[in-house]
Design a protein with these regions (language model features):
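Bacterial N-terminal signal peptides
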Residues: 8-20
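P-loop/Walker A phosphate-binding loop and immediately adjacent motor/lid segment at beta-alpha junctions
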Residues: 84-108, 193-203, 222-223
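Hydrophobic/aromatic beta-strand patches that form the interior of the parallel beta-sheet core
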Residues: 71-73, 97, 119, 171, ...
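Positively charged n-region of N-terminal signal peptides that target proteins for export
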Residues: 1-5
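Cap/insert and terminal regions of metallo-dependent hydrolase folds
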Residues: 155-234
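Di-metal (Zn2+ and/or Mg2+/Mn2+) metal-binding site signature of metallo-dependent hydrolases
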Residues: 61-101
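Core dinuclear metal-dependent hydrolase active-site scaffold
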Residues: 26-67, 71, 101-165, 180, ...
Length: 238
């Protein structure tokens, strides 16, 4: 009986070791959760990283603000992009980066937060948006996934340089009222050369948070249309 008990204990120990090894292997193989993006409408984006960090960009439209933020990014000071008060900030600390900090001293800044690196890039360049008061952002997550958000803009001199980053996704405003329209945005997508090009900010804020008609006018190669309220997994293409 004692011998059988010892054999049973040894069998259980071996099973536990195999289980632990399997879990360790899964983690080593990339057990981290996928990065998820929620398009809230207009230019508002929520991203939950593989580490569980929550990033909001240009809070204003839609729903989905219940998750406490670790990072809030604002591209410029217009009221349809900077409703930071909509977002509950994480009690342990939340970083808020606005265009003012990202363009301090007239230089586009970069910020390394560990789970994501943020690079401010040129935006504006039209009568409604001064390049000295607007930025776009390139976000690169810890798994290598990279995403460009144009902010409110027309074509900028820096856009061709972004092609060298081999971006996974690029979001282009295309309302055609206060910024470039779908045709110009399509031309910008050809300059940036992201693997997936996404139309957003498809209408003036007084009209609607999302226009499928305008989104479909965006004719970029590898176009990806994300509707308001739609969530997707961000994937890094090597």
């Amino acid at each position: 009986m004692i011998r059988n008990l010892i054999l049973t204990i040894l069998t259980l120990c071996a099973a536990m070791c195999l289980c632990a090894a399997g879990l360790a292997a899964a983690e080593a193989a990339g057990g981290q959760s996928a990065t998820r993006l929620l398009y809230q409408g207009h230019a508002s984006i929520r991203i939950v990283t593989g580490e569980g960090k929550v990033v909001y960009i240009d809070p204003y439209a839609g729903e989905g603000y219940e998750l406490p933020a670790d990072l809030i990014l604002v591209t410029h000071g217009h009221s349809d992009h900077n409703k930071v008060g909509l977002v509950k900030q994480r009690a342990g600390g939340c970083r808020v980066i606005t265009h003012a900090e990202a363009l301090a001293g007239g230089e586009h800044k970069s910020f390394d937060l560990g789970y994501v690196s943020v690079r401010a890039v040129e935006a504006g360049n039209n009568p409604n948006h001064d390049v000295s008061k607007c930025v776009g952002y390139v976000l690169t997550f810890s798994d290598g996934t990279s995403v460009y958000f144009s902010g409110d803009t027309s074509t900028t001199k820096q856009m061709p340089e972004l092609a060298a980053l081999k971006l996974d996704y690029a979001f282009f405003c295309c309302d055609g009222v206060f910024n470039m329209g779908a045709e110009e945005a399509s031309q910008c997508a050809a300059l940036v050369k992201a693997k997936q090009s996404v139309p957003y900010h498809t209408a003036a804020p007084r009209d609607t948070d999302f226009s499928m008609e305008r989104a479909e006018e965006f004719k970029a190669d590898n176009r990806l249309i994300i509707e308001k309220g739609q969530e997707m997994t961000l994937k890094h293409s090597r």
